[in-house]
Amino acid sequence: MKFLLIHQQASNNAQSPVRVVEQATGRGVGWINRYLDREYVRRVANTSLRTYAHNLLHFIRWWESVHPAGDIREGDLTESTLLDYVKFQSSQQPRPSPSTINDRVAVAERAIRDEFPNAPCQIARGFHQAFLWRRPMGLGRPRAGMSRLRVKVPKRNIVPLSVEEVARFWSSFRSSRDLAIVGVMLLEGLRSAEVLALNRDDALLSEAQLRVPGKGKKFRLLPLAPETVQLLGHYLRLERPNPCSAALFVSLKGHARGTRMTAAGLRSLFRYHRQTTSIKLANPHRFRHTFASDMIRAGVSLPALMQLMGHTNIQTTLLYVLVTPQDVYLEYARAVAQHIRPLPKASS
C-alpha cells in the first residue's frame, strides 16, 4: 500500500486543503486527515500545515512497512512505537538531522494522542528529561513532569557571511528586482517566506517603512534603511511590470510575468548566484543571521532586535547572535575606555 499527499480546494472552513490518501484508491487516511483538519481550524499557517502533512506521510509509510495492514488500531500501539520510529530514521541513509527526527516524532505523537487518547504512553529511557512544572502565578507545589521523546540536537553555530563574501555575492546581481530582494534580506532581516509574501502596498517608501507579514499571520512594521528605499524605488520604477499582481516581487519573464515570485524561483535565483560566486553558504537564512550579527555589533539591544526579526521569544533571537572573541575584546575595550575609573596614584 502506498500513500501520497494531495492539495485540493477546501470545500469548507473546517477541512484542510492538504490531505494524505492511499495512492491506489484515493481513500483518505482518516486519523491523519482529522488531525490536519483540527490544525486547519486552529488557523495554523499553510506552510506549517504542509509540514505536518509531510511528517505524517513519512510516519504512515514507515508504519505500513512494519504493519502490512496499514490502518493504525489502538491495540497495535505500544510504549515503544515512537522509539521504533526513531530507530528506523536513525538507520536511514542519508540520516535525517536530529531536528527533523524530533519534528516528525512530535507531530506523530500529537496526532496519535488526539486519535487514540487511551493509547500507551510513549516511554523510552534516556530520551526524556525530567522537569518541575509550576502552575500560573506560582501557586501550589511544583509537580514533576517528563519531556516528550526526542533525540539530542547538537548545538549549531551558524557563522554569518563576511563583509568580503557579502560584497562578492552582491556584485553578481544585475537585476533591480534581485538587488532589492537581497537588500531587504540583508538590511531588514526578512525571512524568505516574508519576502515572497510582501505586497506592493506593504512598501511605504514615502514613510521609509515596510509592513511585513510574519509567522502566525501577524504583521510588524519595520523602518527602512535609506539604501533599501533606494533599491525598492529603482525596482518599482524600472522593472516591475505594469499591470501585474498585488505582489511586490513578481516574475519578470515568460508566461508567469507579473505574477508573484515563487519559493522555487527564489531558490533557483540563489542557487545560480552561489555557483557563480562560489560562495556555498550564501542562502536567504544565512543573510538573516548576517543581519542579526551586524545589528548586535552596531549596538542594537536584544529586545529591539527581537522586534526587528519578528520573534516572540528572546531565546530564539539569541540563537542568531554569534559573538566572536574579537567582538568580546572590542566590547571590553570600549567599556574600559568609557566606564572604568582610573587607578588612584600610589602615595610616595
Question: Which residues fall in each region the model found?
Answer:
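Conserved tyrosine-mediated DNA breakage-rejoining catalytic core shared by Y-recombinases
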Residues: E188, A193, A197-Q230
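N-terminal core-binding DNA-recognition domain of tyrosine recombinases/integrases
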Residues: I32-S48, L56-R141
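Catalytic-site neighborhood detector that most strongly recognizes the C-terminal catalytic loop/helix
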Residues: M309, I314-R334
